[in-house]
Structure formats: structure tokens, C-alpha cells
Amino acid sequence: MTGHYSKTEHQYILLTSESASFDHYSVYRDPQLPQIFSHNFVQLHDTFPLERLLNFLPSVPKLLDANYLHLKASPQHVFPLGLKQSLVKSGFVVEDELLYDMKLSDWKGQMGHPLTAWGTAKSLSDGSSIMKIYDSIYIGEAIAEQKLKRKYPFYEADIIILVVCYSDQAQKVPIGCGELFIDHQEKTAKIEEVAILDQFQRKGYGSILVKEMLSIAKSLGMEAAYLVAASTDGATQFYEKLTFKKYERVHTVFHYFLT
């Protein structure tokens, strides 16, 4: 990640991950949650020569102390077709992370949608419950529980604002949530972990949730907001409809070793 958002992204990652910087790359590790891939990866610097990538990859699992390989290129890196083909032929998964951003000076949304809540004991409890349910579907209940315990102190202290979406104005049934990380120094907000339960998706709840998060960010003096989406997760059109703009693309390389 480059430019304006790299400092905010680094601060967000450091909430859960240790960082070690070397000449041409940095290593991020979360010893408490080695199973969470987003907390554990090698980030290449702009100076890393791509011709060395294939020879460098075998060292990544050792750097992460993990049985998988997770690497992010620099946004300045563009993988040649031949390199992509070699990686895929060798069994690596090559995908793109897309960073979308929005300048909040033009955001006209109003905070306080009746289907959303944040900053209360009830919203914290409801949001934590939804986050655990959603994560359990994809990473298993045990790891979801560990992940929630890892992040709960940040939610409780409002270091990360947990915003909740409900099915109706009575706010009895929480159906989604999202993280809002506020970087006051950079005047930048990061939107992360947007989750709507499957049976409530494509009904407008996701839009309500993200719009509320943008309004909260602007009310807190933020000048910009951004999020990171996988090019394969189908959410890119959703964010573009909300007038987010594609800011940059990052190649990622992943491989899971069974032994």
C-alpha cells in the first residue's frame, strides 16, 4: 500500500500483528492467531526485484513460522504474464487486493440511521455476536471465538468502532456489523470486516451499514475513508455503487501446505 493510506493501514495491522522490516520486505505476524491469514503475511517493498520472487517464496513460511505462504507485492509491482503463469503452474494462488477510497468532503449522508447502532453496551454485545456467527461460517467456531477475544478490547475501547445493523427499527435482531478504524493523525478511516448474514444479503442492509460508517467517519473529522476488497469476492460492484473509487491494486500470492 502506498501514499496516504499506507500509514493508516500500518497502524491498523499493528493492533494485532508484530512487524519486522528488512531491506526489501516486511514481515507481519500475529503469534496469538497464526491461523488468521490477514494478520500474517510478508509485504514486499517497492525495491524488491521481481526476478527474485520465485526463489524468495520458499522462505516465506519460515518467516511467518506457519504452514502456509502469504505474500503481498508492492502496489508498484506488476507481475508479468510469465511470472503469473509460473506461479500458478507451481500451485500458488495469485489474486489481487483492490483498495477503494472516498473523499468525505462530498459525502452528504446523515448519521443515525434507525437500523444502525454503535457506541453502546448493547451494540457492542450485538455486534460481537454477529461477528462471531459470521466468522464461524468461514473459519470455524473455535478460531472465530479466538479472533473475537483478540479484537474485543479494541472494540470496547473504541479504538475500533463496531457498527451494528438490525433487521428493523426495534433493534432486536442484529443481522450485520462492520469495523471502523479511525486514524486521527492522518484524518483517515478504514472500513473493515463488513459482514451481513447470508439470509439478509442483497436487501439493502449492507448499503445502510456502510453509509452509516461513512457518516460516522465524517462526523469525527475524517477527510477520507478506504477499504480493501478481494478482486474475487463479488463486492467490488457494491462498493463502486456507493461511489468508492478504485485507488490501487496489489498482487497477492498464497499457498497452504498440508504437511
Swiss-Prot record:
Residues 110-259 form the N-acetyltransferase domain. One of its GO terms (molecular function) is acyltransferase activity, transferring groups other than amino-acyl groups. Keywords: Acyltransferase, Transferase. InterPro entries: Acyl_CoA_acyltransferase, GNAT_dom, GNPNAT1-like. It comes from the Bacteria. SUPFAM superfamilies: Acyl-CoA N-acyltransferases (Nat). It is an enzyme of class 2 (transferase). Its EC number is 2.3.1.-. May be involved in maturation of the outermost layer of the spore. This is Uncharacterized N-acetyltransferase CgeE. It comes from Bacillus subtilis (strain 168). The lineage of its organism: Bacteria, Bacillati, Bacillota, Bacilli, Bacillales.
